[in-house]
């Protein structure tokens, strides 16, 4: 059956919402791995439509383990696939955002196309990444941030992980990932790896009714807010999108080069983030401030992006991000001890 859909998209046909749901279910339920890889490659080459993405998201969310949070929360996430091997900026920014008082429910996974995914660097920082919904809620309430490891909350995707990793190129799942937060966070910062995807995802985000506000952006070839150069994005709320162009230097940031944002493996990236949290200035600290400032603004705790950046900068300077990280590590250790005593 998947072969039928593969032939259809090879002929440049577009799938309906229901067909996109069906093809996703086929991929999750034992289709031939070679056909799945071919389908994903052809779909990426042909280009996805907003309707196809929305249908695939629907199929995946129906099979997910959902998390009901009794308060609004925010996620900072990127599509990945920019192949730049930068430090885990969105993960570090999530910790700084939590230090700024924003409840963070971060959804992520291990690396697919980079050296270190969000789950990898969090483990290297000493965080327990596998938490039940109940443990996650306690973590956010006590620490201000929690992490939902994709294989735990989207177990159906485990079957596709080896295929995606074996492809060694970005696929449609890079677009789907940021839209699959199990907590259905009302607020999101979503970075995308190129401008065509920015336009596509802005149309997809308009179809989601559960979100209050989303900031979707692309910056100088990366799925991160950095000071490399101009950032373009969309502020999406109440069924409308507003295009925004941002010059980081207008907020007091110095321009940087891509080499200043480079990371390594998960241990190296954990070390780099800790240095930034401990007061080391530079391009990485600026990127964390930029992203967290946007989070403060989008969440409504600042009236402008400039004010949000000022709050994030002051919070980082005062060492609050490092304190949140230490608190998160302590929570993780206590959780492991609690589990051990129950066995």
UniProtKB/Swiss-Prot annotation:
Protein keywords: Amino-acid biosynthesis, Aromatic amino acid biosynthesis, Glycosyltransferase, Magnesium, Metal-binding, Transferase, Tryptophan biosynthesis
GO BP terms: L-tryptophan biosynthetic process
Residues the entry annotates as binding Mg(2+) 1: 90, 224
Residue numbers binding 5-phospho-alpha-D-ribose 1-diphosphate: 78, 81-82, 86, 88-91, 106-114, 118
Cofactor binding remark: Binds 2 magnesium ions per monomer.
Single GO molecular function: anthranilate phosphoribosyltransferase activity
Reactions accelerated catalytically: N-(5-phospho-beta-D-ribosyl)anthranilate + diphosphate = 5-phospho-alpha-D-ribose 1-diphosphate + anthranilate
Reported function: Catalyzes the transfer of the phosphoribosyl group of 5-phosphorylribose-1-pyrophosphate (PRPP) to anthranilate to yield N-(5'-phosphoribosyl)-anthranilate (PRA).
Protein family (similarity comment): Belongs to the anthranilate phosphoribosyltransferase family.
Subunit text: Homodimer.
HAMAP family in the cross-refs: TrpD (MF_00211)
Name of the protein this chain belongs to: Anthranilate phosphoribosyltransferase
């Amino acid at each position: 059956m998947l072969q039928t859909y593969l032939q259809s998209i090879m002929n440049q046909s577009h799938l309906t919402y229901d067909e996109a749901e069906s093809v996703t279910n086929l991929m999750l339920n034992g289709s031939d791995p070679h056909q799945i890889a071919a389908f994903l490659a052809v779909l990426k080459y042909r280009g996805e439509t907003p309707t196809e993405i929305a249908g695939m998201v629907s199929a995946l969310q129906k099979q997910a383990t959902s998390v009901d949070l009794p308060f609004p929360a925010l996620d900072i996430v990127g599509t990945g696939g920019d192949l730049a091997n930068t430090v885990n900026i969105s993960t570090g920014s999530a910790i700084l955002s939590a230090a700024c008082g924003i409840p963070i429910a971060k959804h992520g996974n291990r690396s697919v196309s980079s050296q270190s995914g969000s789950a990898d660097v969090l483990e290297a920082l000493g965080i327990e990444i596998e938490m039940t919904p109940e443990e996650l809620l306690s973590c956010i309430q006590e620490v201000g941030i929690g992490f939902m490891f994709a294989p735990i909350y989207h177990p159906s995707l485990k079957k596709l992980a080896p295929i995606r990793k074996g492809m060694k190129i970005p696929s449609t799942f890079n677009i789907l990932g940021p839209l699959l937060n199990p907590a259905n966070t009302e607020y999101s910062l979503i970075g995308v790896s190129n401008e065509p995807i920015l336009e596509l995802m802005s149309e997809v985000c308009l179809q989601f009714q559960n979100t209050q506000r989303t900031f979707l952006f692309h910056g100088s070839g990366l799925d991160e807010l950095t000071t490399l150069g101009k950032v373009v994005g969309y502020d999406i709320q109440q069924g409308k999108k507003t295009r925004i162009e941002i010059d980081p230097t207008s907020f007091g940031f110095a321009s940087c080069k891509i080499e200043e944002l480079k990371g390594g493996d998960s241990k190296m990236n954990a070390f780099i983030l800790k240095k930034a949290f401990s007061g080391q200035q530079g391009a990485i600290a600026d990127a964390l401030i930029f992203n967290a400032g946007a989070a403060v603004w989008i969440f409504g705790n600042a009236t402008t992006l400039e004010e949000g950046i000022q709050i994030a900068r002051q919070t980082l300077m005062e060492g609050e991000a490092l304190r949140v990280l230490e608190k998160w590590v302590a929570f993780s250790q206590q959780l492991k001890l609690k589990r051990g005593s129950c066995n």
